[in-house]
Regions:
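Glycine-enriched alpha-helix->loop->beta-strand junction motifs that scaffold or abut catalytic
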Residues: 25-30, 184-188, 208-212, 236-241, ...
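Glycine-rich phosphate-binding active-site loops on the catalytic face of alpha/beta enzymes
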Residues: 10-12, 29-40, 189-194, 241-252, ...
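Conserved alpha/beta-domain cores
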Residues: 3, 8-12, 42, 164-279, ...
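Acidic, glycine-rich flexible loop/linker segments
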Residues: 70-172, 437, 443-498, 503, ...
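Expand to "…catalyze enediolate/carbanion chemistry for C-C bond making/breaking, isomerization
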Residues: 1-12, 16-17, 24, 39-42, ...
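Structural preference for beta-strand elements that scaffold enzyme active sites
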Residues: 5-7, 30-32, 60-64, 89, ...
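ATP-dependent carboxylate/acyl-activation modules
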Residues: 88-89, 265, 269, 276, ...
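Conserved, mostly hydrophobic/aromatic
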Residues: 9, 34, 66, 119, ...
């Protein structure tokens, strides 16, 4: 199964319930709603359609609200677009009531004049038009700039000043209104645009507290040099990270973006916080059914870097091939995951005093050593599953939680499949439930080993303190085991010695009520014994010890519960007989 999660942006190309359902089936785990576009009514309609698609597919997804953020844009241009040529000189006004002309344009942020300096650059429309500041006209509060390249400039286009600390607010009034709207409609994640300092995140967290929605996770979007410089402090107050490479690639030199991506992913991996690699990952698929080879490499390398999720923007929101974009990204993710041992960044070993995280590390190690394919984490808050995910185990992670909000919050974490169940009353109930749900989820089958982690008291956050290796199988009978071997073979049910001696063949497992010396011809050919009567001093037990033969004695009603010729597994260490071939240890 795919372990890397996919964040898919919804838009005009993905409004239909059937299309959204196809996106889910293709591999989308979280849907992003970009509040830079559209109104609340439009977004609510799409949210409702997502829930319809969930019912249609029987699968759960997360919902992410992406804020517009405090950004600088140009005002409306006279005639719609202005044309500039290299060497053209014009002015930038701070008066947002001015309509742009080839001689003077205006921006929406009056503080830009004070923030920038002569010799610095002002970029427009994602850097498509580059200008250098020649002069600051204090009298008119205008910047005199010279175009560094030919280009067209439209209305309401983005403005960037690379390397400059911009004194815009962390969140705008629109952002606050949008977030409150999202919280009223049960969003799971907030992608906070243009975060530059920790306070920007804390301002959003105040809104969560106001609505008693502290479970909603905040993912700051690092899009500037200032945000990069303050990252270590920003991530401390955040739940994860989105590496928004679009504006970042305008604010810092493009050649630095891959290095920043690797650094930020590594830092998030180290503290176990999920990270999303975003922007232009399969950009050409807005118009083409296949990605460029460079785009395929970009997605794969993000997986190799250790990202938890890869994201689609315009590809799924506005493109001609939204479903194909998701399915293509899913195939690339899986291919890269399979090659991770050879090409991926090794997971560093982290030192910690946190009990849950230590168990997460131990669970990953034990699963690898025993070849376990599924880890089941019983978790109230989701923290246990996140700490296991941090170590990127080869095994799938099935998170059993007791709250729908926790389930949705885990949709972004690498390798985690979350489900909701009724809260069990005891650890034994957790163990039984873990086996049942692992099979129902298709992550394990009879005969597989699973590794279960949970805590006591059951249902309390932060109590993860145990792990158990458990065999999934139909236990037929149990008694006292002699030896420590596991044997798989066909059962031979014998009523007496003559019956046993005539029916037992080399390697079969003798199942009988009792044994004595007359059973020896059969015992010498058998690979194991299951006997209803007797204890550790019985004939069967003594023979088993002397011959090194796995034996289970005191297996009540074994001759009735086990069928003649049935394939069974003898776990003499635990004294258990399982139906079928099981990987008991």
């Amino acid at each position: 199964m795919k372990k890397t999660k996919i964040v898919s942006t919804l838009g005009p190309a993905s409004t239909d319930v059937d299309i959204i359902a196809q996106l889910i089936e293709a591999g989308a785990n979280v849907f992003r709603f970009n509040f830079s576009h559209g109104d609340h009514e439009e977004h609510l309609d799409r949210m409702n359609k997502v829930h319809e698609a969930e019912k249609k597919t029987g699968k759960t997804v997360g919902i992410m609200l992406d804020t517009k953020g405090a950004e600088i844009r140009t005002t409306v241009q006279k005639g719609g677009k202005l044309e500039f040529h290299t060497g053209d000189t014009f002015r930038i006004s701070m008066d947002d009531s001015i309509e742009g002309t080839p001689e003077k344009i205006a921006v929406t942020y009056p503080g830009l004049y004070d923030d920038v300096h002569e010799g610095g650059h002002v970029l427009f429309d994602d850097g498509l038009l580059d200008t250098v500041i020649d002069e600051k006209d204090d009298a008119n509060k205008e910047l005199v700039v010279t175009a560094q390249n030919d280009g067209l400039l439209g209305s309401r286009k983005g403005v960037n000043a690379p390397g400059v600390s911009i004194n815009l607010p962390g969140i705008t009034e629109k952002d606050s209104d949008d977030i409150r709207f999202g919280l009223d409609h049960e969003i799971d994640f907030i992608a906070a645009s243009f975060v530059r300092k920790p306070q920007d995140v804390l301002d959003i967290r105040e809104l969560l507290e106001e609505k008693h929605m502290e479970h909603v996770q905040i993912f700051p979007k690092i899009e500037s040099q200032e945000g990069i410089n303050n990252f270590d402090e920003i991530i401390k107050v955040s739940d994860g990270l989105m590496i928004a490479r679009g504006d970042m690639g305008v604010e810092i030199p493009a050649e630095n973006v891959p290095l920043v991506q690797k650094t930020l992913i590594r830092k998030c991996n180290a503290i176990g916080k999920p990270v999303i690699a975003a922007t232009q990952m399969l950009d050409s698929m807005q118009e083409n059914p296949r990605p460029t080879r460079a785009e395929a490499s970009d997605v794969a390398n993000a997986v190799f870097d250790g990202t938890d999720a890869t994201m689609l923007s315009g590809e799924s929101a506005n493109g001609d091939y939204p479903v194909e974009a998701v399915s293509t990204m899913a195939r690339i993710d899986v291919k890269a995951e399979n090659a991770f041992p050879e090409f991926g960044t090794p997971r560093p070993q982290f030192m910690t005093n946190d009990v849950t995280e230590s168990i997460g590390d131990s669970v990953t190690r034990v699963a690898k050593e025993l070849g376990i394919k599924t880890i089941v984490a019983a978790t109230k808050s989701g923290y246990t599953a996140r700490m296991i995910s941090k170590y990127h185990p080869d095994a799938d992670i099935l998170a059993i939680t007791f709250d729908e909000r926790t389930r949705r919050g885990l949709m972004i974490n690498w390798g985690v499949t979350p489900i909701v169940v009724d809260e069990p009353e005891s650890t034994d109930a957790i163990f039984d439930l873990a086996s049942k749900k692992a099979v129902e989820s298709g992550l394990a089958k009879e005969g597989d080993l699973i590794l279960i982690t949970g805590g006591m008291p059951v249902g309390e956050s932060g109590t993860t303190n145990l792990m158990k290796v458990q065999l999934i199988g139909s236990k037929l009978v149990q008694g006292q085991g002699v030896g420590d071997k596991t044997v798989i073979g066909k059962a031979v049910i014998a009523d007496n010695a003559a019956d046993a001696n005539s029916k037992v063949t080399e390697g079969s497992i003798l199942v009988t009520k009792t044994t004595d010396k007359e059973y020896m011809p059969a015992i010498e050919k058998a690979s194991a014994l299951v006997v209803e009567n007797g204890g550790l001093t019985s004939h069967a037990a003594v023979v088993g010890i002397s011959m090194g033969l796995p034996v289970i004695v005191g297996a009540e009603n074994a001759t009735d519960k086990i069928s003649d010729g049935e394939l069974i597994t003898i776990d003499s260490h635990r004294g258990i007989v399982y139906h079928g071939a099981s990987n008991a240890i």
